[in-house]
Curated annotation (Swiss-Prot):
It is a peripheral membrane protein. Keywords: ATP-binding, Cell inner membrane, Cell membrane, Membrane, Nucleotide-binding, Sugar transport, Transport. GO terms for molecular function: ABC-type maltose transporter activity; ATP binding; ATP hydrolysis activity. It comes from Rhizobium meliloti (strain 1021). Belongs to the ABC transporter superfamily. It is found in: Cell inner membrane. This is Alpha-glucoside transport ATP-binding protein AglK.
């Protein structure tokens, strides 16, 4: 089994550049998730790794071998798509065996791999069924099993859960997590726009925007220490609250004046040259707490209350023009619409970004 190395990978369609010099080193056995909004280039990058898209510039290495000009079938890669791509007239067994038959593997080897993959994915009772007799989640497991049978160097998943309903999505996500544990030596790359999938499955997450890598890191690293405003607002749901601010004091701690005049001190170091500059103050909804103390972070009027049972979302007006601040309270919050509420948060949970959106913590 092997890793994958991307060096200055670029992709253009005519005069339009869509992937801009990607550098990424994926180690053997890593589960790496590409995540980002629609149009960020994550699926294009995955297709380039698979050999389905030509590489415009840069070098790609699999197992130390440069594969820019190696056809997809020779790269040692198996891919699972959003659509299951199963042959409707073939049984589950035949669908899983098809690629090996084309490769002229022996009947004994085909049977061993198919039954091994079926046992791993709990598909053994369904081997004689046609795809139409399976649920969506079972069909996706067949597609994954077909990929396992190829014994690939690298697994590629292109939004494999997008066609499933919420309950099946959770169940299949758990199956993929178990698969990753059982095949711990196999490198896996997974594309999704769903941050829950990214946070729960990945060893490392690659956040992409407009064909650029914004940040690479472990899930909690991206959540707790976002490199910039884009990552801060993309990772986490609801998104991080961002309030315009002005830096009023610098040093090992930084003081800022928030929109509305409230002064806040953060455990974030800044240089003296930053004094007087505009900045963006950030705090996650789940890090806010209601307080009655005079030493509060900010206050505002509750415009909407969404009581979800497990949590309550409070939408606060009056701090940012045309955008409410969101507070995520555990359980049932005894707060009503129209109430004026004060909020606080631990200093360690506060973020500050410069005029270019880069974190002062980085």
């Amino acid at each position: 089994m092997t890793g994958l190395l991307l060096k200055d990978i670029r992709k253009s369609y005519g005069a339009v550049d869509v992937i801009h010099g990607i550098d990424l080193d994926i180690k053997e056995g890593e589960f790496v998730v590409f995540v980002g909004p629609s149009g960020c280039g994550k699926s294009t990058l995955l297709r380039m790794i698979a050999g389905l898209e030509e590489i415009t510039g840069g070098d790609m290495f699999i197992d130390g071998e440069r594969v820019n000009d190696v056809p997809p079938s020779k790269r040692g890669i198996a891919m699972v798509f959003q659509s299951y791509a199963l042959y409707p007239h073939m049984t589950v067994y035949d669908n899983m065996a098809f690629g090996m038959r084309i490769a002229r593997e022996s009947k004994e080897e085909i049977d061993r791999r198919v039954r091994g993959a079926a046992d791993m994915l709990q598909l053994t009772p369904y081997l004689d069924r046609l795809p139409k007799a399976l649920s969506g989640g079972q069909r996706q497991r067949v597609a994954i099993g077909r990929a396992i049978c190829r014994n690939p160097k690298v697994f590629l998943f292109d939004e494999p859960l997008s066609n499933l309903d919420a309950a099946l999505r959770v169940a299949t996500r758990i199956e993929i997590a178990k698969l990753s544990e059982r095949m711990s030596d196999t490198t896996m790359i997974y594309v999704t726009h769903d941050q829950v999938e990214a946070m729960t499955l990945a060893d490392r997450i690659v956040v992409l925007s407009a064909g650029h890598i914004e940040q690479v890191g472990a899930p909690l690293e991206l959540y707790e220490r976002p490199a910039n405003l884009f990552v801060a607002r993309f990772i986490g749901s609801p998104a991080m609250n961002v309030i315009p601010a002005t830096i009023t004091a610098t040093g090992q701690q930084t003081a800022v004046s928030l929109a509305g005049g409230k002064s806040v001190t953060l455990d974030v170091p800044t240089n003296a040259s930053e004094n007087g500059k505009t900045a963006s103050f950030g705090v996650r909804p789940e890090d806010l707490r209601v307080t009655e103390a005079d030493d509060f972070l900010f206050e505002g009027t509750v415009s909407i209350v969404e009581a979800l049972g497990e949590v309550t979302l409070l939408y606060i007006e009056g701090l940012v023009e045309n955008e409410p601040i969101i507070a995520k309270m555990p359980g049932i919050a005894r707060v009503g619409r129209g109430d004026k509420v004060r909020f606080t948060a631990d200093k360690a949970k506060l973020h500050l970004f410069d005029t270019n959106g880069q974190s002062y913590r980085a």
